[in-house]
Amino acid sequence: NGDLFIFIIDLYRNQQIRKQMGNDDGRLHTMDIFFQALQDTMLAVQNVINAAESMGLGIVPLGTVNDDPKAMLKVLDLPELTYPALGLQVGVPDQEPQLKPRLPLEFTTFENEYPRDFEVSELKDYDEIVQTYYDLRDANRRIDSFTNQINGKKLNTHQNKRDDIVEAIHSQGLALDFN
């Protein structure tokens, strides 16, 4: 329900401009330029989210576009130096979902120095809030907590097609050079 947007990291266009103006690819294959393009793409995503929400539309960010990166590249028939960064579904909401609880500020912000020392027990209150959130949802109800998700099987040695992301990015000619 709604429209699907897939936001693409696009350095192909820059390559074509350089080529038509008599230049080689220059630094287009570097990690630095890849990160700049990724950041530009994420800013575009955020701008579309802001615009959609200002019009009363609902949004669902979809990281699942990278669940099978090789298949996604094939389906989208993308040229070299491009890569699908994020999907976004935009549409008229059929319900008013409860907002997912956010980590407390003391775990997401800092001043001048990253706080390295904390105890998992400090997340107890947040875990309870997240557990209640999942338990009260209309769809995909479950008993779960933030710390259980972080400590769960997804971050163990679990192998899936998402493990091919770096290979897929490199196959597109992106982030090949770390200089």
What label would you give each PLM region?
Residues N1-N179:
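Acidic, surface-exposed loops and disordered segments
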